[in-house]
Each structure stands twice: as structure tokens, then as C-alpha cells.
A protein has these predicted regions:
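Glycan-processing catalytic domains of CAZymes
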Residues: 1-371, 375, 379-391, 398-431, ...
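A conserved amphipathic helix/loop scaffold
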Residues: 374-570, 574-586, 606-608
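Short, aromatic- and glycine-rich surface loops/edge beta-strands on solvent-exposed regions
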Residues: 592-608
């Protein structure tokens, strides 16, 4: 391989891409990785080992510390034809070299891989500030300054757009361990894109860390891009996750795609940028089946992405965390983020986030249908707003260490949780607000399902990763037990119980109060010009039903034997509306089967 050949490859990729997609802008980027994973690097490990941090791989290789300085050498570089002067900051050298390299070879952007610019030990929870036992806040200011200076020095020399990989951890863990000032980096107009979700779910089954970490990094954004990355193949490490990590199951599509953020204006946003790692496998093959099989799920996940705040919203203090010098807060954010990670792994369906700064700008109407989750607020205004929302009937959960919780007096509609309690404490606390999620596991050591719930078009969409398919999951929500479309639910003491496959994605528009029996919910052919959907619900035994139509559409209930017949409208159902749950039909003492009909036309007068 030569630079001339590489430049030709870049040019060919753009030309062929333009032929295939005439209306698209074809960009080709280059990667820089901090370790030895992707390429042999004489520069890192022979000429300039002084830039390698403390973390080692197999006691031989380490990761580049972006805050390091270079010793002098006499090699010829594009940006330094006479060699590198002693004491040159790595950020300056890297920026100048990148500008020359990307320009000369025709690249359009640079991808900073595996945590470069954030940490020199991106997979660890220890670092320059936290050694695993003690925090060293006296090192914080220098660590923050050095990291931020890398970005400023690099950007001074390199004009190309940057995309980032980030670490596998969260904003709070990265700050507590290494002093990563992510809020300052985002706010500095550096022309970077926020890191995408990590591949930790695929690599070690830790969906909680993937989901939690991603939410902390996208509660604020440096630009308009909200990325989602799917781990399809790996061109370096021999695995193709669609088959050998996901078992052909789309769980790592639907769960991260269920994540949403609420921006400063109170609007719900979902991923708008798709990254695929990668289209080719380690042998250079591009098998069609690895595109054709997950593609429908990617499209469906986009179709079902949230358009309103989820039932549970996390208020995350990115700015407060990453500008703090308080040793006790370092411990707080570290323990708190781990607690949320563990709670998600325990089945808490948390998939919506906003920053505390954005939260203060929002009207109460944004959160009418949600339960709010927050660490003990550092900003008194956040605590006062939480109290105000609680006084209006909105549930609030505040978590922290015992010491921090002492500063928060108890108030109505609020649960306080100690982060050093068992991980199931958060899931169990949801019952105080009418949400019961329980598991029947064949062995105590079995990992519970990971669940995401998104709200779209007046429905809830459940996304599930079930680590063990012998586990039963039972739900009971404030409006009744959720009945998922395309499923049968065994009713146990008023809860709907399911035995999920490895990965599930289900729509929910039906909630039921019924003690026992088996309730089935299946889509039926509407066979009707007036109604575009007919959902058959059977197995009803003196049940109370609450049915949520698509936003703004006419809805009715028919008791006809089949949809081929003219609908027989059921007058026992009444249209209702309340601020906490929206618009729905309610019927009581219903037995047998019904058809839930959803209209074809939008009703301008319908209550949303």
C-alpha cells in the first residue's frame, strides 16, 4: 500500500458512490486509533512510546494519551519535514499531520477511534483521578485543562470535521476517573459529533452500560447529529455480531433506537444519523444476508421511534457533573451512573433523557405522562422544579448516596433511593407510581430482561433483550396490564405475563384489568373503507379495557364475529381523556372478544 494507491481508492469510492446514489453527498473519512488493534504502529510503540498512557494490553502495548508531549525526532513528516521539535504537544502534531494527510489524499473527515481525546484508558473505570480506591480532586484541574487543550490545539491545526467514538463508560464515570470535561468540549464549537452508542451490549452482554452511557452523552449535543451505530461486522476482530453475538436477533437495534432525548425547547428527538460497523467482515466479504436480515428491523425501529417523552425520563446533570471540583460529587456521579446501569440491566425501562439545564426551560406539560428520575440535584432550581412537578401529581425519584440524600427532605410523590442499595431497588420503587415489573426466573443468577419503552403516536413500544428465554416477565401499569400486539398474555393476579424471545419489539395500545386467564391480541384484516386497522382482543373475562387509538384518529369497538361482517358497535365503550394518559376508549365488564377499530382519516376535532 502506498499513499498514491490509497488516494486512488478514496477517489474511486466517491466516484462509484456518486454513480450509485446520484443525489447523495458521498464522504470518505479516515480513522485514527489510540491503540494497537487496527494497525502496526512504529510511530506509537518504537519512535514515541512517551505518548503511551499507563494502561497496557498483554503487558506490551498501551493507548495513546492525547494530552502527552512528544520528544524530538529527526524523521521526515508531511507537517514536520525536519522532524518533531522537543516538547511538541501531541494535539498540535496530530492536528498538523491530519490536515496534511486528509487534504493530500482526498478525505472528508476524521474519525477518532476508541476514546481518543477523552481518555487514555477508555474501557476502564479508573484513571488519573480515581485509582479504584481513592479520588484525587487535586489532580482534576490539570487533567481537565490538558484534555481540553488537546481539542483546542488539534482544532487550531486541523479544519476537517471530526466524528468520535468516545469511551464505553458514561459522562459521570469518565469525569470521576479521568476528568473528561465533556460539557466544555461540546460547548467549544469544535465541529465534532457526539459519540454513538458503544458496542458493549454485543461484546459483553452489558446493555445497561450501552444504554446508560449513551443517554449521558446525548442529553446535550455539540451539533444537530444524534448518532446510532449498529455493530454488524468487524473487519479486524473476527466476528459478525448479527450471527455470532446477537443470534440473528434485533435486540441491539431496537433497544438503542428506543432511546430519545428532550431538547431545550421540549421537543423529543431520536437518532438521526446511522453508522454501520461495518459492511465487510474480517475476510473482506460483504454477505448479502447480513444486510437483508437486519435491514427491516432498522427501518422498523426508525418508524417506531419516539415522538413524545417516555414513561420514565432521566434528568442528567452533564454541566454540573463535568464542571465540579467537589470530591464528594466525584464519588456521587461514579456511584450514581453505575446504579442506573445496574438498574437498566435489572429491567428498569429507562430510555429517555434530558439535561438538567434543558429541564429548567421546560413547561410542566412536557412531563405530564412521565415519571422523573434524577440524582440529588446540585442546582437548587432543579430540586424546586421537581417539587413543583410532584405537587402537580408527577412522580419523582431522586437517587444518591446516604450523605447526599440527607440534604433532600421528603415530599409527596417522591421516592428517595440509596445508590448503594441492591440494583432491584429502583425497579421495585416504580410500584409506588403504579408500575410493577417482575420476573419469574428459573435460577436466581439468571440475568433479567433489558427493556426499553418509547412513546409514539399515542402508544407505547416495548423493546426487549431477554438474556434467558425461560424467564417470564409480568407487567402492571397505572392504566392496567399492558397487552402487547401480536402476543398472548397469561393474566396472573392482574398482571400480564410474557415469555419473550431473545429480542422483541412490540406495540402496546391495550391495557386491561383482569385477574386471570389468557388474553390474546392479534392484528386482523380490517375489510372496511372507514377503518384502517382492526385489532382482535380475545380471552376477556369481565375485564376493564382501555384502548389507545393512533393520534387524532377515529376509534370504535365492534363485537362482530369477524371483520368480514359490518361492525357491530359496542356502546359500553366511552371516549375519555386525562392529562396523565391522554385519549383512550374505556369499557367495563367485557367478556369474550372484541375488535378495536382505528379510523383511516385524521379527526381534526380528536383529542390527542
Amino acid at each position: 500500500m502506498t499513499y498514491r494507491i490509497l488516494k486512488s481508492i478514496v477517489s474511486c469510492l466517491k466516484a462509484e458512490g456518486k454513480k450509485a446514489f446520484p443525489g447523495a453527498k458521498i464522504r470518505v473519512g479516515e480513522t485514527f486509533d489510540i491503540g494497537p488493534e487496527f494497525a502496526i504502529s512504529e510511530f506509537k510503540y518504537e519512535r514515541h512510546p512517551e505518548i503511551i498512557g499507563l494502561l497496557t494490553l498483554q503487558d506490551k502495548f498501551g493507548f495513546v494519551d492525547a494530552t502527552s508531549t512528544l520528544h524530538a525526532d529527526t524523521h521526515t513528516y508531511a507537517a514536520y519535514p525536519s522532524g518533531i521539535p522537543e516538547g511538541t504537544p501531541f494535539g498540535t502534531f496530530f492536528g498538523k499531520q491530519s490536515e496534511a494527510f486528509l487534504s493530500d489524499l482526498g478525505f472528508d473527515y476524521l474519525w477518532l477511534s476508541n476514546g481518543l481525546g477523552f481518555s487514555d484508558n477508555p474501557w476502564e473505570v479508573t484513571g488519573k483521578i480515581f485509582d479504584g480506591e481513592s479520588y484525587h480532586p487535586e489532580k482534576l484541574e490539570k487533567a481537565k485543562k490538558n484534555i481540553f487543550n488537546f481539542w483546542k490545539l488539534f482544532r487550531k491545526e486541523c479544519s476537517f470535521p471530526l466524528e468520535t467514538r468516545g469511551t464505553n463508560n458514561s459522562v459521570g464515570i469518565d469525569y470521576a476517573s479521568d476528568g473528561v470535561p465533556l460539557y466544555d468540549i461540546y460547548s467549544a464549537d469544535l465541529d465534532i459529533t457526539a459519540p454513538p452508542n458503544s458496542p458493549w451490549a454485543a461484546l459483553n452482554d452489558n446493555y445497561g452500560l450501552e444504554i446508560m452511557g449513551h443517554m449521558t452523552r446525548i442529553c446535550e449535543l455539540p451539533n444537530e447529529k444524534f448518532p446510532f451505530r449498529y455493530y454488524l461486522h468487524d473487519p479486524w476482530w473476527i466476528n459478525s455480531p448479527w450471527y455470532d453475538r446477537y443470534d440473528g436477533s434485533p435486540c441491539d437495534v431496537y433497544l438503542p433506537m428506543a432511546i430519545s432525548r428532550i431538547d431545550a425547547e421540549g421537543k423529543t428527538q431520536t437518532a438521526n444519523s446511522l453508522n454501520i460497523l461495518s459492511i465487510d467482515n474480517s475476510y473482506g466479504d460483504m454477505p448479502d444476508n447480513c444486510v437483508n436480515e437486519p435491514l427491516p428491523h432498522l427501518l422498523k425501529a426508525e418508524k417506531d421511534a419516539a415522538d413524545a417523552p417516555a414513561p420514565f425520563v432521566w434528568i442528567y446533570p452533564m454541566r454540573e457533573y463535568t464542571t465540579s471540583h467537589d470530591e464528594s460529587l466525584l464519588r456521587e456521579m461514579n456511584l450514581g451512573d453505575h446504579y442506573i446501569c445496574d438498574a437498566i440491566n435489572d429491567g428498569v425501562p429507562l430510555s429517555c433523557v434530558t439535561s438538567s439545564d434543558s429541564f429548567l426551560k421546560h413547561d410542566i406539560s412536557v412531563y405530564r405522562k412521565s415519571i422523573l428520575l434524577s440524582p440529588v440535584p446540585e442546582n437548587k432550581a432543579v430540586l424546586e422544579k421537581l417539587k413543583h412537578l410532584a405537587s402537580q401529581g408527577i412522580g419523582v425519584i431522586i437517587y444518591g448516596t446516604k450523605e447526599k440524600l440527607q440534604a433532600v427532605q421528603s415530599f409527596a410523590q417522591c421516592k428517595r433511593l440509596d445508590v448503594e442499595m441492591p440494583q432491584e431497588s429502583l425497579r421495585k420503587a416504580l410500584a409506588a407510581f403504579g408500575y410493577s415489573i417482575t420476573f419469574d426466573k428459573k435460577e436466581e443468577t439468571v440475568k433479567p430482561p433489558t427493556i426499553g419503552i418509547a412513546r409514539r403516536d399515542n402508544a407505547l413500544f416495548f423493546s426487549v433483550y431477554n438474556a434467558n428465554t425461560t424467564t417470564d416477565t409480568a407487567f402492571k401499569f397505572p392504566m392496567g396490564a399492558p397487552i402487547l400486539c401480536g402476543c398472548e398474555a397469561e393474566m396472573k393476579n392482574g398482571a400480564s405475563s410474557y415469555r419473550f424471545a431473545r429480542g422483541e419489539h412490540r406495540e402496546c395500545r391495550i391495557f386491561i384489568e383482569q385477574e386471570s386467564g389468557v388474553v390474546s391480541c392479534r392484528e386482523a384484516a380490517p375489510v372496511n373503507a372507514r377503518y384502517r386497522r382492526a385489532i382482535r382482543i380475545s380471552g376477556l373475562q369481565s375485564a376493564t379495557l382501555r384502548l389507545f387509538p393512533e393520534s387524532g384518529r377515529e376509534a370504535a369497538v365492534s363485537t362482530a364475529p369477524i371483520t368480514d361482517y359490518t361492525p357491530i358497535f359496542d356502546s359500553r365503550f366511552e371516549e375519555k381523556y386525562d392529562e396523565r394518559h391522554g385519549r383512550y376508549l374505556e369499557g367495563k365488564n367485557i367478556s369474550g372478544h372484541i375488535y378495536f377499530l382505528i379510523g383511516r382519516e385524521i379527526r381534526e376535532s380528536a383529542i390527542i
